[in-house]
Design a protein with these regions (language model features):
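Ser/Thr/Pro-rich, low-complexity mucin-like regions
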Residues: 138-198
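Bacterial N-terminal signal peptides that target proteins for export
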Residues: 2-13
Length: 231
C-alpha cells in the first residue's frame, strides 16, 4: 500500500502536469467586432453617412509576439459602398487604420498596414492586414490588446444602386465580412496557434447578426495561394 506521503507527492506532481498541459493548450484568442473591442457587436446597420469602425483584438498573448496577419473577405459583390481600393468609388484614402480602440490596451510600437484588393476571379473584395511588433513588448496574457482598428469613411455613401456625383451607392445592401485566414508569428493553424472567437461580421443583417446568408469566399485553405498572388 502506498504511503500517504507518496500519494501526496503523486497528487502534487499530477496537478502540476495538468496545469502545464492546460497552459500548453492555451492559445491567443482573436475577436472581430464592430465599434470597440468590448462588447462584441456582430452586425451594423447603415444609418446614414458617417464613419463605421471594425476592430480586431486578442487576449491570451504570450512571448514571443512579433507579427500578425489577417485576410478578410468582403462580399458578396463589388458594390460602390465598400469599394475602398484604388480606382474605385470610395478609393483607398477613405479607409484608415490605427492601433488603439475602446475596451482594449494598446501594444507599444505596433505597426499596422491594411489594404483592400478586388478579387481576381470572384466578385469579392479582400482586406489584407499585416502588423509587426517591436522587440521589448511583454504581453499580459490576461489583457485584451488591439491588433487593428479600421475606420471606413462612409461620409459619401448613400442608398440605392446608383452613384450620384461625388457619392457611392448601395450602402443599404446586406454585406458580410469573413476571416479567410490569419497568422500570429507566421503560424496560421486555427486551434493550435490561435482561436477565433467569431469570424464573421454582417452589415444590414440585424435579424441574423454575425451569420452570413450569402456564399462569401472564406477559404482558410487558400492562405498560401493568396499570399503568393498579392505579395
Amino acid at each position: 500500500m502506498a504511503s500517504p506521503t507518496l500519494l501526496r507527492t503523486f497528487g502534487s506532481t499530477l496537478a502540476a502536469l495538468l496545469l502545464l498541459t492546460t497552459c500548453a493548450r492555451a492559445v491567443p484568442s482573436i475577436r472581430y467586432s464592430w465599434d470597440a473591442c468590448d462588447p462584441v457587436v456582430l452586425d451594423h446597420e447603415f444609418v446614414g453617412p458617417g464613419h463605421y469602425v471594425q476592430t480586431l483584438s486578442v487576449t491570451g498573448l504570450v512571448l514571443p509576439f512579433t507579427s500578425f496577419e489577417a485576410h478578410i473577405a468582403i462580399g458578396p459583390g463589388l458594390f460602390s459602398a465598400w469599394a475602398f481600393y484604388n480606382g474605385a468609388c470610395q478609393g483607398a484614402g477613405r479607409m484608415t487604420v490605427s492601433t488603439a480602440a475602446g475596451g482594449c490596451q494598446t501594444i507599444p510600437g505596433l505597426l499596422v498596414t491594411a489594404n483592400v484588393v478586388p478579387g481576381l476571379t470572384d466578385p469579392t473584395a479582400h482586406l489584407y492586414v499585416t502588423a509587426s511588433v517591436p522587440a521589448g513588448f511583454t504581453p499580459d496574457p490576461t489583457a485584451r490588446y488591439t491588433l487593428l482598428r479600421i475606420d471606413f469613411d462612409h461620409t459619401a455613401t448613400t442608398t440605392g444602386s446608383l452613384d450620384p456625383p461625388g457619392h457611392c451607392g448601395s450602402g443599404d445592401l446586406p454585406y458580410c465580412f469573413g476571416i479567410e485566414s490569419m497568422a500570429i508569428n507566421a503560424h496560421s493553424l486555427p486551434g493550435r496557434d490561435f482561436d477565433v472567437e467569431n469570424g464573421v461580421l454582417t452589415w444590414n443583417l440585424a435579424s441574423t447578426p454575425g451569420q452570413c446568408p450569402f456564399r462569401v469566399a472564406v477559404r482558410p485553405s487558400t492562405w498560401g495561394r493568396l499570399k503568393s498572388i498579392y505579395r
